[in-house]
C-alpha cells in the first residue's frame, strides 16, 4: 500500500484514535516511560526535538510536559492526524510546537536537533526506507544528539511472531479493548512492515550511531536508542 493509502487509514476515526491506546498498547506506561527516560537529562534549559510520525501529538505532549523548555517539531504524513495534534496544543505557548506534513521516510528531514523521537510509526515503512531514515536522522542530529525509537517489532521466527500476535489480542481484550477498536487496529496492521529488534539496532550502528541501547522489550513492543558522536 502506498504512503497515501496508509495516511488514509490513519485519518479515519482520528477523533477517537487515542482513546483505546492504553488497551491496544498493553504495556503503555512502561513503553512510553522508557522513551522519556532515554531523553538525556543534561541537555540544558532549551533543546530541539523532532517527533517522527507524531500522529495526534501524544508523544510530543509527553515530551513537552516532562521537558517544559523543549521545542518540539512534529511531522506526520496524515493531515487529519496533524490537525488533531494542532488542536491538542492550541492553548500552548506560541512557537514552542510546530507541525509539518511530510513523508519522513522519503523526504529530507528539516532542521537540526538535539533529540529525535518516534513512537509506533517507523514500522509502517519498508526495511530499506528504515535504513535510509536512520542515516537521515543521524544527519540532522547535532553532535551528542540522541535518537529514541519506540515501536512494534517482528518476532524472530514465525512461531514467535504468532505468539506475539495471540498474546497481544488476549492482553488487549483483558484490558477492555472493544472488538471494534481491535478490528480497526488489525486493519491498520495489514500495512505494517515490522522488522526484528536485532535488525533495527544493526541498522542504527550501520547509520553511524554509537552507544546503541536496547532499553525496553515486551513481546511486540520495544524501545531502543543511539547517540551521534562527534567525528
Identify the role of each PLM range.
Residues 131-143:
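A short glycine-rich, Lys/Arg-flanked "PGG" loop and its adjoining helix->strand segment in the class I
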Residues 210-231:
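Core SAM-dependent methyltransferase catalytic element
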Residues 27-45:
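Conserved alpha-helix/loop element of class I SAM-dependent methyltransferases that forms part
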Residues 11-29:
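Class I SAM-dependent methyltransferase Rossmann-like catalytic core
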Residues 150-206:
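C-terminal alpha-helical "lid/dimerization" subdomain adjacent to the S-adenosyl-L-methionine
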Residues 1-16, 168:
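N-terminal, positively charged/glycine-rich alpha-helical extensions of SAM-dependent methyltransferases
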Residues 108-116:
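A short acidic, Gly/Pro-enriched loop at the edge of an enzyme's catalytic core
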Residues 50-52, 56-106:
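Class I SAM-dependent methyltransferase SAM/SAH-binding core
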Amino acid at each position: 500500500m502506498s504512503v497515501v493509502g496508509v495516511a488514509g487509514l490513519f485519518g479515519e476515526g482520528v477523533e477517537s484514535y487515542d482513546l483505546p491506546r492504553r488497551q491496544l498498547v498493553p504495556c503503555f506506561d512502561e513503553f512510553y516511560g522508557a522513551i522519556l527516560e532515554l531523553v538525556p537529562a543534561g541537555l540544558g534549559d532549551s533543546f530541539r526535538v523532532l517527533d517522527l510520525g507524531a500522529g495526534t501529538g501524544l508523544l510530543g505532549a509527553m515530551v513537552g510536559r516532562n521537558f517544559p523548555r523543549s521545542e518540539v517539531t512534529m511531522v506526520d504524513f496524515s493531515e487529519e492526524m496533524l490537525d488533531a495534534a494542532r488542536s491538542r496544543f492550541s492553548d500552548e505557548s506560541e512557537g514552542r510546537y510546530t507541525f509539518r506534513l511530510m513523508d519522513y521516510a522519503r523526504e529530507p528531514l528539516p532542521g537540526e536537533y538535539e533529540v529525535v523521537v518516534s513512537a509506533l510509526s517507523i514500522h509502517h515503512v519498508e526495511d530499506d526506507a528504515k535504513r535510509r531514515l536512520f542515516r537521515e536522522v543521524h544527519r540532522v542530529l547535532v553532535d551528542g544528539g540522541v535518537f529514541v525509537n519506540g515501536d512494534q517489532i517482528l518476532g524472530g521466527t514465525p512461531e514467535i511472531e504468532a505468539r506475539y500476535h495471540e498474546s497481544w489480542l488476549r492482553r488487549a481484550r483483558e484490558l477492555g479493548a472493544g472488538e471494534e477498536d481491535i478490528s480497526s487496529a488489525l486493519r491498520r496492521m495489514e500495512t505494517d512492515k515490522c522488522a526484528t529488534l536485532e535488525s533495527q539496532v544493526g541498522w542504527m550502528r550501520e547509520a553511524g550511531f554509537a552507544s546503541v541501547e536496547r532499553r525496553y522489550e515486551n513481546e511486540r513492543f520495544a524501545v531502543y536508542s543511539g547517540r551521534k558522536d562527534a567525528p
